């Protein structure tokens, strides 16, 4: 029996039989786990209303199999208020985590980066792109794929703002011709290292880099959430 309560968020939920749910979770202390919530879809179930994505939860469970059994659930607060483009962005973040996180690994720091991302999306006024790019870069680091934006791997020397560099997967940035369509300027890399996405040029560079860096880990299966907000060009 797992007696402890854990702060958790639901990344994805799906029906199981007529009355139960399978929940894919990000938890503070135990990383990504899967639970079965028995009876959660029954008409009088108290669980039905708050076993939803973006609702901060306290959960406890039991079992030794890959899919645990939910034993208790309490909402910590109401759901993080996400609508429109910001809701689609949250679904994208959830799908990234479901696809990329290995189960039962401690991702405690990532849990708080995820919470920060949701809060940033909830408070954003115009665009979700800054919050998404910061989270994608943090996710790469937590997965062990962090990138040194400030040095050329060929020489070990600091990148030069006026020069052009190309990213080599799991290696780093190498010198590249100025007209390289896949290149990044040293200035852009310096901005990415700071997480400083204050202008559209840097935001576009950040988006291009995270797409390149995440693609090998996501494989060929497309993200379902991207089809929801393709019209927003995220």
From Swiss-Prot:
Pfam families: RecO_C, RecO_N. Gene3D superfamilies: Nucleic acid-binding proteins, Recombination protein O, C-terminal domain. One of its GO terms (cellular component) is bacterial nucleoid. SUPFAM superfamilies: ArfGap/RecO-like zinc finger, Nucleic acid-binding proteins. The keyword DNA repair applies. The keyword DNA repair applies. InterPro entries: ARFGAP/RecO, DNA_rep/recomb_RecO_N, NA-bd_OB-fold, RecO, RecO_C. Keywords: DNA damage, DNA recombination, DNA repair. One of its GO terms (biological process) is double-strand break repair. HAMAP family: RecO. Involved in DNA repair and RecF pathway recombination. Belongs to the RecO family. This is DNA repair protein RecO.
